[in-house]
């Protein structure tokens, strides 16, 4: 049976089970990570019973002994005294668990370890894990930078790489704040999550700056040819570099000198409309998103990093002016980067286009009476509704907005479950259990697109006829592009026929009679609660609230 509202893991559980565990070489233990404690003392003499906690099981818990070489040994009293002073812990000095084979692991953040090895690199704000040849590896992107490149625009790297993710995340940050007019992703680094070993790979072999550093520190780097196919398949275009590029393109997409100096056609990255009102007032930008999609100039869906543009200025009329993507798939061949990796594709919408920007699309979602009613029902009682990322997607010659909606119990151990999907195309809004159904609502029937969640809850798959032209008749702008000679696709299109009286009725979601009954009961219980509260009849109010909770629980069960 397919459980559509929960993620499907390759490996999960404690102890872990899944496809990775089936491999004898898989090492699931993580001693180095962005969230690791300041230090840890590990290791024991050979033959000693293990006492390091591994994972909970039974009343005692499973134990393990670290077998790597991840830190200095502290078996003698002098070393223990030094580290006790450094970390301000008398346990290092007096604990009987510190023995002749003990190692102390510190500097456990992957980014920190790479910075210790290569302090001359500027490091990307996001570190991500991948399983490479059976080992968990943290991947860190490294940049060479300069502020002395002739005839180039100076940019504050810290400001250019800020967005709502860096503002709210404890593990993702912007680039170091410094001015630069030269930046290249010249290095890919990996940190082994088990023993902390660092490997540096030259990614951009043509970069003169990294060539100079290689001469200063011979033997520090592995060559591109040494990157295994397994590691290559996990490498991707880095976010911070893309954010710097999208910031520069807000001005430098203009090719006319007069328009450039007047600034009349400048763009800006939209504020993240899913953030709080306070964050939006501080102009916290929408982050780029990794998506697999087909854009102008690509012949098939490509793993890409994407962002959008709106006109510069403070106008409240927010329309979409451009859509930027970069091919982020590095391929899976040893020592060979994918042919289109790093290709920027800019799709520019016509100046007379009225395609809503992300903020306007979010307002359309919020203003829908049907959407608000059902979200209020889902949020009543002990559940909270969480809006997901607002995604901009090219579809059928136009652009659509997609936003997942999650429901999360108020319990401390609960996690969000996908319950609904919002879709907007022009002024039309779809709201259904799956992306496939929401697209059908927006396009008044068969959207012609087969979404990845088209599989029904019972595991069966609905068949669809490919009618790609259908998806292009709603309210969006065409954005068909052609490749530029410099690796950037600049594309523009014309307005599609946007007659709101034809071809788009909004559709209706299919709903079982039991689910309708449960939602009607919940609606009636809410009315009864309001009436009882106005009368001051708290006994009736409590009874109505009980019925409301029962109806909502039943509705949630029926939707799973």
Q: Could you tell me what each predicted segment is?
A:
Residues 4-489, 495-499, 504-535, 539-543, ...:
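Soluble extracytoplasmic regions of secretory-pathway and membrane proteins
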């Amino acid at each position: 049976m397919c459980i559509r509202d929960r993620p499907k893991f390759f490996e999960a559980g404690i102890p872990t089970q899944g496809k990775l565990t089936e491999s004898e070489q898989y090492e699931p233990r993580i001693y180095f990570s962005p969230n690791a404690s300041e230090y840890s003392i590990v290791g024991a003499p050979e033959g000693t019973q293990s006492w390091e906690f591994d994972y909970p099981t039974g009343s005692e818990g499973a134990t393990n002994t670290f077998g790597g070489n991840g830190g200095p040994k502290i078996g003698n009293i002098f070393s223990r005294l030094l580290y006790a002073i450094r970390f301000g812990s008398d346990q290092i000095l007096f604990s009987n668990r510190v023995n002749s084979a003990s190692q102390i692991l510190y500097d456990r953040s992957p980014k920190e370890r790479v910075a210790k090895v290569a302090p001359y690199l500027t490091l990307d704000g996001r570190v991500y894990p991948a399983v490479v040849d059976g080992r968990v590896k943290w991947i860190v992107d490294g940049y060479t930078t300069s502020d002395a490149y002739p005839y180039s625009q100076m940019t504050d790297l810290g400001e250019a790489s800020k967005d709502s993710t860096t503002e709210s995340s404890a593990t993702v940050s912007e680039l170091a704040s410094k001015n630069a007019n030269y930046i290249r992703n010249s290095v890919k680094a990996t940190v082994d999550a088990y023993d902390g070993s660092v490997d540096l790979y030259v990614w951009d072999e043509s970069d003169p700056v990294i060539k100079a550093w290689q001469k200063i520190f011979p033997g520090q780097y592995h060559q591109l040819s040494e990157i295994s196919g397994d590691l290559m398949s996990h490498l991707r275009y880095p976010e911070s570099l893309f954010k710097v590029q999208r910031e520069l393109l807000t001005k430098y997409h203009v090719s006319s000198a007069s328009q450039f100096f007047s600034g009349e056609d400048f763009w800006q990255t939209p504020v993240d409309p899913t953030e709080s009102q306070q964050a939006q007032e501080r102009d916290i930008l929408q982050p780029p998103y990794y998506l697999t999609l087909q854009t102008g100039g690509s012949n098939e869906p490509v793993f890409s990093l994407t962002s959008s543009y709106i006109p510069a200025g403070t106008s409240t009329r927010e329309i979409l002016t451009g859509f930027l993507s970069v091919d982020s798939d590095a391929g899976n061949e040893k020592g060979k980067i994918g042919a289109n990796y790093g290709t920027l594709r800019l799709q520019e919408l016509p100046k007379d286009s009225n395609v809503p920007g992300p903020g306007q699309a979010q307002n359309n979602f919020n203003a829908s009476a049907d959407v608000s009613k059902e979200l209020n029902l889902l949020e009543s009682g002990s559940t909270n509704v969480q809006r997901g990322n607002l995604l901009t997607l090219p579809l059928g010659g136009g652009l659509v907005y997609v936003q997942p909606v999650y429901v999360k119990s108020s319990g401390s151990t609960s996690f969000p479950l996908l319950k609904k999907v919002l879709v907007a195309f022009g002024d039309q809004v779809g709201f259904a259990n799956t992306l496939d159904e929401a697209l059908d609502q927006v396009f008044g029937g068969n959207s012609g697109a087969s979404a990845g969640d088209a599989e029904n809850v019972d595991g069966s798959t609905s068949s669809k006829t490919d009618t790609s032209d259908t998806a292009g008749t709603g309210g969006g702008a065409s954005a068909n592009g052609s490749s530029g000679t410099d690796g950037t696709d600049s594309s523009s299109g014309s307005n599609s026929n946007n007659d709101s009286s034809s071809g788009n009725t909004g559709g209706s979601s299919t709903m079982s009679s039991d689910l309708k009954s449960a939602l009607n009961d919940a609606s009636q219980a809410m009315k009864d609660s309001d009436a009882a509260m106005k009368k001051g009849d708290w006994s009736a109010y409590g009874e109505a609230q009980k019925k409301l909770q029962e109806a909502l629980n039943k509705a949630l069960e029926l939707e799973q």
